[in-house]
């Protein structure tokens, strides 16, 4: 009984501390003066900066801020003191793009960040990256060559992950070379019938996957894949070791060759995942979607563009976009190859145009 009472007191203390922390939390709020965040070229945008503590403006707070085109600020100031906890900043853009206001507040030895980004004539944005003349031909031939390697799929039931409506498996299949596999988590409705399918492609990183039994339980086949050619049900420590070791910065591997690029095998793997789904007897042969965010958003767009069997697409803030925007000092998509890794040589430029 004493142990139970002691545990109860500990829980009360934790709750009290949590409430106190939340009540005193610091927030940096940056707001543009258009509710839709969209502006005409040359129109002034006024950002209101507020530093709040417990929902009240914090006086005499010190901030740093950057203002200008996304990733290329033209106004940078440090150690600005806000006497009443608020500040108004103005900017504009003469060409289509995004104006960003980024603020860091320094309070009691800690740094808190906030930002807002307004759009200037976003519908007028045009890609800088050039489309190679042989783009589709290259990928058609690459996939044709990959398909000479049979899928040889393997499926292992995961009883602990099965639900009332769906069976869940770890699956793997060959992609472009003997022994080279993609791994993922497959969910198939238990009820006999033909079903639509959804392919989930991942954001950047190295991690395990749980699969998708929640989007439409018992009504859709789902396949959530990893891209690194390793099982997706191992201990987290394995993925952490790989992320910090052999797969650290994997997105830079093979940057000098379209064939050796790390993403060559990844794109082929995503397309072979479509092959695998289409081989399932439970697939209805009519409705196949692909979705993902960031790196997964890019892979969603790529997969849908290169495979006509994909009938619907949902890409969330896709990465790997317009790498050559760097040359016009305009933000490109992650991983911002030339922004972080220096000016490219011609081979690197040729390579990124295929990804």
Tell where the protein language model's regions lie, with residue ranges.
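Hydrolase active-site cap/lid region
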Residues: 297-347
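Cap/lid segment of the alpha/beta-hydrolase catalytic domain
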Residues: 207-268, 276, 324-334
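Proline/serine/threonine-rich low-complexity linkers at boundaries of modular beta-sandwich domains
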Residues: 20-28
